[in-house]
């Protein structure tokens, strides 16, 4: 943890908030039809530090981290289970996964959840190549986010590849 904090002091752009993320999470959680949970493939302590630096208090939302499961699918399922208890829901009518990495695309596909990507430039291109149909640049336009959360679709299965490498 000390190393992460030292790197952050040296480069203030590390772990910077994706524009609008903190206010979006709070606002979205006030919507009756949407509830927020945080799932991260990072270890709890480092993920909480990164969220804190980005202005997000992980304790405000149900959450799960790498400490909670060996796979990203299990981490996400654990976050959902915590959210069901936290929000007193037997099950959610719709779950949309939001992510910025290829592992997020794979996890959403494996769990058959609609997916909304977040990224610009090369990151956006990689998400789209991996199958993301909707990718936003950041969380600064709330109405845009709501539209894409509503429109997000379950990702198609990856095409089967032969065992040959080219």
Region locations from a protein language model:
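Membrane-embedded alpha-helical bundles of multi-pass transporters/translocases
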Residues: 1-4
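Short, acidic loop-to-helix structural element flanking the phosphoryl-transfer center
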Residues: 6-38, 44, 48
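Short beta->alpha linker loops
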Residues: 16-20, 42-43, 67, 100, ...
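Substrate-recognition "cap/lid" segment bordering the active-site pocket of phosphatases
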Residues: 37, 42-96, 102-111
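Short acidic-hydrophobic, aromatic-tinged amphipathic segments that line or gate anion-handling sites
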Residues: 64, 134-141
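Acidic, Mg2+-coordinating phosphoryl-transfer loop and its flanking beta/alpha structural elements
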Residues: 97-134
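Short amphipathic alpha-helix with an adjacent loop that forms part of the alpha/beta core around
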Residues: 142-155
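Cationic, low-complexity basic patches in intrinsically disordered or flexible, solvent-exposed regions
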Residues: 159, 165
């Amino acid at each position: 943890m000390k190393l992460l904090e030292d790197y952050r002091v040296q480069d203030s752009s590390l772990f910077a908030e994706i524009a609008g993320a903190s206010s979006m999470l709070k606002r979205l959680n006030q919507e009756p039809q949407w509830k927020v949970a945080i799932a991260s493939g990072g270890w709890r302590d480092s993920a909480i530090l990164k969220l804190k630096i980005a202005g997000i208090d992980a304790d405000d939302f149900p959450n799960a981290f790498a400490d909670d499961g060996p796979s990203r699918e299990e981490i996400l399922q654990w976050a959902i289970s915590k959210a069901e208890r936290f929000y007193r829901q037997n099950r959610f009518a719709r779950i949309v996964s939001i992510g910025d990495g290829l592992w997020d695309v794979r996890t959403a596909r494996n769990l058959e959840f609609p997916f909304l990507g977040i990224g610009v430039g090369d990151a956006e291109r990689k998400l789209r190549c991996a199958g993301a149909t909707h990718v936003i640049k950041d969380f600064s336009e709330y109405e845009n986010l709501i539209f894409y959360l509503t429109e997000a679709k379950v990702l198609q299965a990856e095409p089967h590849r032969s065992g040959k490498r080219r």
